[in-house]
Curated annotation (Swiss-Prot):
Cofactor: Mg(2+); Mn(2+)
Name under which the protein is recorded: 1-deoxy-D-xylulose 5-phosphate reductoisomerase
Keyword terms of this UniProt record: Isoprene biosynthesis, Manganese, Metal-binding, NADP, Oxidoreductase
Top-level lineage group: Bacteria
Organism: Haemophilus influenzae (strain ATCC 51907 / DSM 11121 / KW20 / Rd)
Pathway: Isoprenoid biosynthesis; isopentenyl diphosphate biosynthesis via DXP pathway; isopentenyl diphosphate from 1-deoxy-D-xylulose 5-phosphate: step 1/6
Binding site residues for Mn(2+): 152, 154, 233
MF terms in GO: 1-deoxy-D-xylulose-5-phosphate reductoisomerase activity; manganese ion binding; NADPH binding
Binding site for NADPH: 12-15, 38-40, 126, 128, 217
Organism lineage: Bacteria, Pseudomonadati, Pseudomonadota, Gammaproteobacteria, Pasteurellales
Catalytic activity: 2-C-methyl-D-erythritol 4-phosphate + NADP(+) = 1-deoxy-D-xylulose 5-phosphate + NADPH + H(+)
Protein purpose: Catalyzes the NADPH-dependent rearrangement and reduction of 1-deoxy-D-xylulose-5-phosphate (DXP) to 2-C-methyl-D-erythritol 4-phosphate (MEP).
Binding site for 1-deoxy-D-xylulose 5-phosphate: 127, 153-154, 188, 211, 224, 229-230, 233
EC assignment: 1.1.1.267
Amino acid sequence: MQKQNIVILGSTGSIGKSTLSVIENNPQKYHAFALVGGKNVEAMFEQCIKFRPHFAALDDVNAAKILREKLIAHHIPTEVLAGRRAICELAAHPDADQIMASIVGAAGLLPTLSAVKAGKRVLLANKESLVTCGQLFIDAVKNYGSKLLPVDSEHNAIFQSLPPEAQEKIGFCPLSELGVSKIILTGSGGPFRYTPLEQFTNITPEQAVAHPNWSMGKKISVDSATMMNKGLEYIEARWLFNASAEEMEVIIHPQSIIHSMVRYVDGSVITQMGNPDMRTPIAETMAYPHRTFAGVEPLDFFKIKELTFIEPDFNRYPNLKLAIDAFAAGQYATTAMNAANEIAVQAFLDRQIGFMDIAKINSKTIERISPYTIQNIDDVLEIDAQAREIAKTLLRE
């Protein structure tokens, strides 16, 4: 079997590192062909030393220059590229077999679309591609013959729980025709699911980034605490699985053992379970339709004391309700919400605003954006930019 060339968009981030771990566990199957990052020279340098990719790219031009000099000094032949255009070209490289799209935020949008338009097999971990570009993105997947495989643990669990016919029609699967009645999205509820609401004003960034089950970056940890993460996943799930609002259900499951479920019309519920480790869904997408070793501890059922399920309280999680409503309002609203949330979360991490202010900034930003029908990527980027400016203005008010 010929080794698969993997391009990792966001190799220095949490998902990127987990992807490299799966590659390391399967050196006979996969090669880290190209590694892409932002400006973290040291992390990228270490990855290049260890995995010897053909290419390494950094968005920051100065950082790329430093990386190039360091690699030359150590006689590492990796070719270093810089800037967004080079990253988009790597995402569409003719020698690339699979693209791990895991750059966080709107920055990951163009490279991911570039991979789709090149007809690549895209392992999707970048939420923004669907949150901001849902219809455009799904249409591009179909028009360019790209293969989309969801990496997010919840969407991957849903994917694994669907019939093969649905797996082959991501974005266009007719759920009701295949006997599916509901998609159940599970979430841990974050670290504050039992915290009294009156204490929410005192929540610190340190408390918010300490996720009880998953190892994640700061931004996504805060999103998990506010359940914006689940809101974004709700939006993604509706696009990925062609699901109506009536075909969606969101449940809090504190143990994060069941990663999501699918209800069928005959009363069956099919679920995917496992230890909360992102290497499982990463390995599943890389090897699909086969399986490969991920290096994950097997689930020990005797250590699971209980599995509990709680209905989400929108007073506790206003961002979740906001995301559900934003999808109903249209693509402009989900794009604006996502952009505002990036600004608001960073402001919270920088101690400029309180924990409860994140949802307020997001909601007010959507209110101030004029309803607009998105027709192309430029429209998306325009609304994204507008929403960021509005959110920054709200921070100053």
